[in-house]
Amino acid sequence: MLNAHRYNEKTASISRIDFTILGNKEIKYTSALGKNTPGLLKYEFYDNTEPQKGGLIDQRMGVTSNDLECRTCGLDSNFCPGHSGHITLAQPVFHLGYFEHVISILKCVCTKCSKLLVYKNEEDIIELLKSKKGKNRLNEIKNLVKSISYCQKANYGCGNPVPKIKAEKKKATIEINIVAEYAPLNQNQNQNPTDEIDKKPIKEILTPMIVYNILKNISDRDCLILGIDPTKSRPEDMIHTEFFVPPNPVRPSVRADFMSSGPREDHLTIKLADILKANQRLAKHMESDDKNLIEYFQDHVAYLQYHVATYYDNESLKLPQSEQKGVMTKSLVSRLKGKEGRIRNNLMGNQTLWERV
């Protein structure tokens, strides 16, 4: 039995609750699969009739049947709360829940040197730090940088032009991108500045890897000005490099009837299998020496990004809906929102047993 988690009857007082980003390091550290492992590697659910070790219903993440014991805590399904796992991604991908926040931060920093675009010693900034916090502070910084066109060298910047940051979702190619649009440069002095070619902005695709590195290089001081406490969360944690796998009791297997050939898996488990397959395909592609495959690299990244996005939200995104045998898969957002969701239907119900929540 793996001694990753042990429960006892000792109690302790709760001093406070901090709502922070579930970072990549924390996802790996709290995983029942081990923080020094690549996480789940097998998308098969069963080995003969037993849950596949290293698969998506690995018994180290909890059990959903009374005749089984959890391989982490040793408890049965009545008492085991379940334990989270993780998938180490071959390439970073965007977390759609933080997508707009990432765009807001990118508008406030240089895309080349990650420096904040405003002067840190301005009176406006000093007053801002005193009066605004969190999201309100970030919105104020966004307003201050609207008129800045270059990363100012006097502010220890690099002098790079400041682009317009936009989101781009392509339904035909299932791509989700962040685009940096730079003002057109007239390189030919003899060319008429009214020509059509001069009016086209210069576009740069900011891939999740590029965005991850930009956010990672933002200093702790700049994070504080942006309303982020770097001792609790870092901006790069809004980009997935490790993917959180919820415990088995959150997505239990269901046996339809005694005549069925086997258990029916939850929609979240099916989507996790899609993510795992896309991730393994991308990893094999990256290990290949075939130069002809290079052009398909971004397609594999986009495919992984698509399955991660539809895992969270399979309805409101401007993307093709993910389906399983002709039925739309139920995403994480679908479980939470609406009158039939977990919050209004379960947690706010009159018969909720709050000590179990």
Give residue ranges: language-model regions.
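Conserved core architecture of multi-subunit DNA-directed RNA polymerases
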Residues: 1-357
